[in-house]
């Protein structure tokens, strides 16, 4: 009899659609507007995620460096994501035990704007082999591939991941 996984990254199909697995070896927190922490599978509205969040790395040390990737695997819509993935943000060279403000932003934050259906927005944290090791930078955001990016930059599997769901807001909701 097959075992049903309770891992939210498997249930939410982040593992499978975006990455092959996640080591979950480092703790990462993502917080919008200083009080809206991202939890796997929770819904956040576009008005809450307009500005880049604070992303903290609770692991490694000042000699360990990490790369953060934020992506939307449900483009243009979750029922037919033929443009998978859309890249929203990349920050490299983040020292362990700090936050993304200490890293190097190579692709600026783009706020989520889902048009069709409920989209997953995925934060992935990769451990770098050394500072400055991320050299292959995507030239465009559309049809980004997290697996290829990780492979090209020798990042391996993510050491932390979290995702939230987001859908288009009605005008009444934004008030």
Curated annotation (Swiss-Prot):
Keyword field contains Cytoplasm: yes
Keyword Glycosyltransferase found: no
Biological process (GO), any one: negative regulation of flower development
Record keywords, A-Z: Cytoplasm
GO cellular component: cytoplasm; nucleus
Superkingdom assignment: Eukaryota
Summary of the knockout phenotype: Plants do not show a phenotype similar to those of TERMINAL FLOWER 1 mutants.
A UniProt-annotated Pfam family: PBP
PROSITE patterns: PBP
Subcellular location: Cytoplasm
Coiled-coil positions: none
Tissue spec: Expressed in tissues surrounding vascular bundles in hypocotyl of 2-week-old plants.
Disulfide bonds: none
Protein role: May form complexes with phosphorylated ligands by interfering with kinases and their effectors. Can substitute for TERMINAL FLOWER 1 (in vitro).
Similarity annotation: Belongs to the phosphatidylethanolamine-binding protein family.
The protein's name: Protein CENTRORADIALIS-like
Lineage: Eukaryota, Viridiplantae, Streptophyta, Embryophyta, Tracheophyta
């Amino acid at each position: 009899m097959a075992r049903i996984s309770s891992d939210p990254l498997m249930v939410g199909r982040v593992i499978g659609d975006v990455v092959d697995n996640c080591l979950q070896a480092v703790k990462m927190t993502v917080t919008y507007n200083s009080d809206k922490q991202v939890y796997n599978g929770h819904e956040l509205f576009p008005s809450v995620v307009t500005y880049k969040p604070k992303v903290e790395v609770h692991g490694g040390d000042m000699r360990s460096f990490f790369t953060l990737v934020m992506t939307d695997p449900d483009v243009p819509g979750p029922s037919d994501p033929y443009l998978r993935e859309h890249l929203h943000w990349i920050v490299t060279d983040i020292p362990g035990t700090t936050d993304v403000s200490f890293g190097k932003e190579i692709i600026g934050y783009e706020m989520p704007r889902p048009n069709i259906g409920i989209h997953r927005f995925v934060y992935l944290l990769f451990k770098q082999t050394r500072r400055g090791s991320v050299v292959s930078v995507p030239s465009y955001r559309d049809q980004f591939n997290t697996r290829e990016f990780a492979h090209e930059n020798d990042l391996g599997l993510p050491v932390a991941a979290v995702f939230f769901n987001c859908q288009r807001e009605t005008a009444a909701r934004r008030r």
